[in-house]
């Protein structure tokens, strides 16, 4: 799947874009395969100035402090 198309699916299905989300969680919420969820989150991170963080448990999470709004 094209990263922009995967991002569109994630944009429509993620319940709370302001909370930290892992690729696995995005995959479960959206129904996308892991590969597509990762590509979509990467696209959204670039498009909406998201950030990547590592949790204390070592999980990589995507953060969108302003949700899916362009500033």
What are these regions (language model features)?
Residues 1-71:
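A composition-biased, non-transmembrane "mature-region" signal
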């Amino acid at each position: 799947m094209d990263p922009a198309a995967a991002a569109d699916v994630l944009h429509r299905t993620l319940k709370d874009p302001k909370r930290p989300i892992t690729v696995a969680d995005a995959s479960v919420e959206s129904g996308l395969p892991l590969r597509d969820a990762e590509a979509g989150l990467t696209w959204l991170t670039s498009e909406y100035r998201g950030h990547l963080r590592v949790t204390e448990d070592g999980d990589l999470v995507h953060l969108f402090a302003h949700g899916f709004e362009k500033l």
